[in-house]
Amino acid sequence: MKKILISTGGTGGHVIPAQVLYDYLYKKNEVIIATDNRGLNYINKNLYKTKKIDVPKISKNILDFIPFIIFFTLSFLNSYFFLKQKKIKVLISTGGYMSIPTCLAARILKLKIFLFEPNLILGKANLFLLNYCNKIFTYSKSIINLPKKMKYKNFVIKPLIRKDIFLAKTKLVRKQKKFSILIIGGSQGAKKFDNLFKTDLIKLSKNFKIKLFHQTSSKNLKKLKKFYFENNIESKIFSYTNNLHKIIKKCDFIITRSGASTINELVFLEKPFLAIPFPFAKDDHQFHNAKHYVSKNFGWLVREGKFKQNFLYKFIRKLIKNKKLLLQKKKNMHNFVKRYDWKENSKKFQSLI
């Protein structure tokens, strides 16, 4: 039985893969997830063994440099002594600057280090840690920014999909009577989405029978509920939830940001989507994620800056009038994911580490 630490933190995009890896490995190994305060918000502590290791946020302000160095050193020492005390043999990092202190401590202790890159462009933290790792797990052979001399470390795996989503896929759901649209702002919510679509949604509701499911930030719930109520649009408004897949299954069409976990879950559940990447994502990784899957004809992609009034109305009107457009996307996704198998994926990953 190996002792494994999975290092993660920050947003759901880093934490969700960590949870999947935990579920793959915990039955035959002793596994712990190390995360920062933000990451703990996405983890059910009754299901996962966790260790909090807070890491200072990188700041461009020169006045923050000395506090950053002190806090970073404390994070490193915390990681080092925890790894040593628990006799950890394998470290898996799911990316982000939060994992750097733990990875450096693991390097000094000469542990096996495995990196995971969920995006189609290599993140800066993973790029920095490449020299120290045994392998880096990705979803593609063609990862942007992966140095040629490091390509031998790239090991392509199937997307890390949560077990509850595997189970949910086979369950039947009651079909909505109206054309159902889900708007996903991501684990952090997308305030821009709350305002970007309003005029078009009002117009759609007056011309077609539609139902809206809208995931937003908890701060904007009240305001958004008021908007839908005042415009007589049938809707369900909610903040971040671990059961989003249950809502996805009910819907005909998804409008979403394009974090790796979200896009992969939509593809697995065979739900056509319109991706609107977060324009300020690091290295524009959301655009590259969306572009990769749109090139496989699973959905559509539009830049937020090019999103004009009346675009969404015309786009969804076309989908409602011509169901074949959605059916073709669903067929393409079905052919892509039909060989996904939870037990097989788990067994394969066990053998890799």
Regions found by a protein language model. Give the residues of each.
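Conserved nucleotide-sugar phosphate-binding/catalytic loop shared by glycosyltransferases and other
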Residues: 6-9, 27-71, 158, 218-220, ...
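A short, glycine/small-residue-rich beta-strand->loop->alpha-helix junction that serves as a flexible
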Residues: 6-19, 191
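Donor-nucleotide binding loops and adjacent catalytic segments primarily
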Residues: 19, 34, 39-46, 166-170, ...
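Active-site-proximal region of nucleotide-activated glycan assembly enzymes
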Residues: 30, 38, 107-168
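An amphipathic, basic-hydrophobic alpha-helix
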Residues: 61-90, 108
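Acidic donor-binding loop of glycosyltransferase active sites
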Residues: 88-90, 233, 249-264, 271-272, ...
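Conserved donor-nucleotide binding/catalytic region of nucleotide-linked donor-dependent transferases
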Residues: 300, 308-340
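C-terminal alpha-helical cap of glycosyltransferases
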Residues: 339-353
